[in-house]
């Protein structure tokens, strides 16, 4: 048995590990690095066509975003994941491919004027579709034999809908060794989804440590703190713009805002509008609504039993088209705008930053981890001026939701 760590061994994003055991070669995750780190993920030391399969811990792009490239380069094995992860990846990989194609087209238009060589997208929609076709979805807690001497099981880890730790039993020369890959571990008492499952035994554990250098305090009052931010900003006549991961964090925010509205924690602004301005987030929210309730926690199921949708409320609006997105910034009413991408590297959020970042009455609210060299990280580290669409924009109106960056 041999393990080679290919990503996320010196940075947070770009998770990928090669397991060679029982005559098989499997990748655990195949993620895209977020931002322009000084490090680059190492090349996979075997040809993609020689890899037997991939085990995906969850759907976030830093764990699955290079799967279409793997397929483009010759991978033809199976991709194993939980059923919700497989469904979420079907929208997330298409979206990632669209971004790759759009950015390549933009660079080529810009480079044409300077005589630069044309660039190709890292991968295309066609590559993403080919990767999606290789997914095989499984239930939690079900043992799956990948090959003689190689058995896995997905266990709920409470990070994201469908997220898992993966238990792997390797039998070689009559001896069995148990490995556990933690995946990204969720917080206790996270809304909607269940708390992480505790595993009792393993010979080797490979564990994420995004926040391994600190101790978390008591559970913050996310609803109360968010309500105060909304109240202060609306009272100034501003918007609250939230760069948010389309899958997971957006649905958590909807859960919190539903409670804020239900308890009337923001006063004087009526049924204030909340926009989801991300086609991917809209699709992900649909998947959440259609998911088997057994994936949800007791609180979410109690709401469902009463006929209450945990992530639906009066004033919630969705923006699908570009025209609908642009219209948001012509409306003077104070509002919440939730848009992707969560690290501000792409997507419609960059347009909303252009329109709101310089306005002192507005708040740009960060609610997730910001990788090194991303625009979001630059803002959190105190950047006072940023470039957006070739324009220099003064940065005066950003903050973060305390302790909600995991």
Q: Positions of the model-derived regions?
A:
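His/Asp/Glu-rich metal-coordinating catalytic cores
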Residues: 1-55, 64, 71-252, 258-267
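Short gly/pro/ser/thr-enriched loop/turn and capping motifs at secondary-structure boundaries
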Residues: 86-88, 213, 281-283, 371-374
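Acidic, Ser/Thr-rich peripheral helices and adjacent loops at domain boundaries
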Residues: 101-104, 287-308, 375-395
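Hard-cation-handling environments
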Residues: 229-238, 244-372
